[in-house]
Amino acid sequence: MKTKLILIATLLVAPFISSAQTHSESSDVVLTNLGKSVNSSWSDFCPVINADASVLIFTSRRPATKNEIKADTNALERIYISKFNKSTNSFSDAELMGPEVNEPGRNNSAIALSNDGQSLLIYRDDDQGNGDIWESRLVGDKWSKAKKLPAPINSPSHESTACYAPDGKTMYFVSQRSEGKGGRDIWTARRDNEGKWSMATNLESLNTKSDEEGVYIHPDGVTMYFSSKAHGSQGGYDLFISKLNNGKWSAPISMGAPFNTSSNDVFLVLDASATKGYYTSANSGGFGMEDLYLVSFVKRKEEPGPRLTLLKGKVYDEKTGKELEAKLEIIDNSTGTKVTDLNTNILTGRYMVSLPGGINYGISVTAKGYLFNSVNVNMPDSAGYVEVEKDIPLKRIEVGTTIVLNNIFYDFDKSTLRNESMSELDRLSSLLKENASMRIELSSHTDSKGTDEYNVKLSQMRAQSVVDYLKSKGINADRLVAKGYGETKPVATNETDEGRQLNRRTEFSILSK
């Protein structure tokens, strides 16, 4: 590992740092040493973060015990974790991760953390002088024993760095396999719903006859940061950006100063807002040979930031407040295709997912013994970066329980179901098939616009449209009751646009089970 990933530990931006915090050559960037709670008098490098940068995991050559005092260059590399404390605006004291992550007697290096912070990718060297990529999962508050990823991610050649795209299915990784364009190349592969990986594809538009390294995909899903010895590098590795557009990666653009110098510049990670990131610097004013630094980008007013929504929160039992282990399935409502799925933390019920803008998302939340809950997130592509904290309650499957179907949409002033509704209706159909004796009422509600008579008629027709769709999916009509309530059961004021939107809804209630 020391010979394979030493380049990642040598992000030399010393010419631009003269103290713990200073402005770089560019007035839009501020560099700040993370301090002694994270850094040590040994080398600390390879920072990785989750999407909101609340968790920082990194690699260090510091001794694990008082008896283990060795020269920095001979010390084993191990993985440490630190968590951000909002009240102190700083990271907690770094803690050595357990043997499930740090295999004793080997070099272990953190190379990527998933957006939700529940999947950690690890580099480990092997007995043949090569290296492979391993993965550990967060189960409650414990990390699982790391498992070596299968082919086509790992090969007999050397694999050094990797990361997941926001969908959690697509992986980008660096490999020195002979089928590449030369040296270390960036490759990609996708895992299907059964856990099988596709063939690895070489990113030919980014790779060169020289070496590429340190691949990282931003939570927006379309911005790649990587390093290369080519593409007009100033010397050694330089950092570059490429954008994904219509399935193709753009020509790499150098990040310039202060990131690129005459030395090797590798491995930059940014949070979802793209206002801050972390990397390693060998600075004479730091604590050790290499320290971890916060890089803050001073965003101009005209810059909207990444076009994405960072949605996070917890799933819980509505009655008891107990946090739940649940599954979130995210659908592109316009196409009905699944974007991704993820699980909440089994101990805290928390989740976090990044949703690129310009898509109408339907999010279904399910847990054993509970009715599904649905969330609609529809952010225009022009909205820029938005962070939303949303706790999601689930109701047990009980007679009298009512839930709102948040992803049911009708044509304006009509009862015609729009295509965006089909995924939600299919979930309801599946629920009824899984509970073969369940009878439900489908109710539709309007706001106060229009006459009472008209609103009752429209809502009845809309409720019937839902019933008709479920019948077409094989649900017996005897199990379905359509009821239009018009404006008679508001859940919010009709004096505001927001209130009227809440009142326009479709619900189902369990009549018997």
Q: Residue locations for each model-derived region?
A:
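A short, solvent-exposed beta-strand micro-motif common in secreted/extracellular proteins
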Residues: G349, I359-G369
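Short, solvent-exposed beta-strand/turn patches at coil↔beta or beta↔helix junctions
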Residues: E398-M438, T446-Y454, D478
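Structured interaction patches on ligand/partner-binding surfaces of diverse proteins
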Residues: K368-D391
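Short, acidic Ser/Thr/Gly-rich low-complexity loop/linker segments typical of extracellular
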Residues: D332-R350
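Short, conserved micro-motifs composed of acidic
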Residues: Q21-K314, E318-K319, I359, Y385-E387, ...
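Short, ordered, surface-exposed loop/turn motifs in non-cytosolic proteins
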Residues: G183, E318-T335
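Periplasmic OmpA-like peptidoglycan-binding domain that tethers envelope proteins to the cell wall
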Residues: T73-L76, S228, S233, S443-K513
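Bacterial Sec-dependent N-terminal signal peptides
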Residues: M1-E25
